Amino acid sequence: MRPMAMALAVQEAINNVSAYVASFDGSGAAPAMTTTVAASGTADATSTDTGGQAVTVAAATSGGSAEAGAALYTTCIACHGADGAGNQALNSPRIAGQSAWYLTNQLKGFKAGYRGSKPEDIYGMQMRPMSMTLADDQAIANIAAYITTLNGAVSPATLDGNAEAGKGLYVTCVACHGADGKGNEALKSPNLIGLQDWYVVRQLQNFKAGIRGTHPEDINGQTMRPMSMTLADDKAMKDVAAYIISLRK
């Protein structure tokens, strides 16, 4: 009976998300987003070309100071790189191009312990003490603002996923992350464009296994977990990741 109940829970979650998105205007379109000018002095997202692939660099919307964040970011360089491109050898994702609001939420999550506190989350546990070097919410806002100024190159595919098969699976993701994969702040859905395929797969595995998205304070993670359960196995996850990479073009 338990698998049946889980299947119903997953479908209900999908229906709820779809209904919420549809409530915006009847067409399913999300409301227009308002961008706040950060201390870095830029409000508009910019695009950079990396190896023939256009990647959007998110605008800073945290209200933080990118200048102050630059000094704080020195702690992050060893793993994420000076340009925020990440490092697979260190299991560090690309953070360049990510939205300030999402970076802020995740850093707060690590610091509060609802992300990176489970023994199974080895790499999350490595990140948690890093978040604790940030004294307060202002420091988090500052470093998030600085990261939005980075434009580290995206990584090529590393897995053998099938993008065509992943396209069909991605329909579940469209309501929150968008057909273009760029996310939606109103739905607390991050930008997926530019993330490495291995990182996408690992996070889907973590959500499905309950390593992520089960803490009572992780409201947004709880929304994502049933979505991960729609993917039958690791192959399906690799296929979705391959399709997400194809959205860069």
Feature annotation, model-predicted:
Residues V17, V21, G69, C76-A82, ...:
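The canonical Cys-X-X-Cys-His
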Residues M1, C79, A96-S99, N105, ...:
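Mature, folded catalytic cores of secreted/periplasmic enzymes
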Residues A70-I77, G97-A100, T104, K167-V174, ...:
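Sequence context surrounding c-type heme c attachment/ligation sites in exported
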Residues D25-S27, P31-Y73, Q88-N91, T148-Y170, ...:
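Electrostatic cytochrome c docking/interface patches
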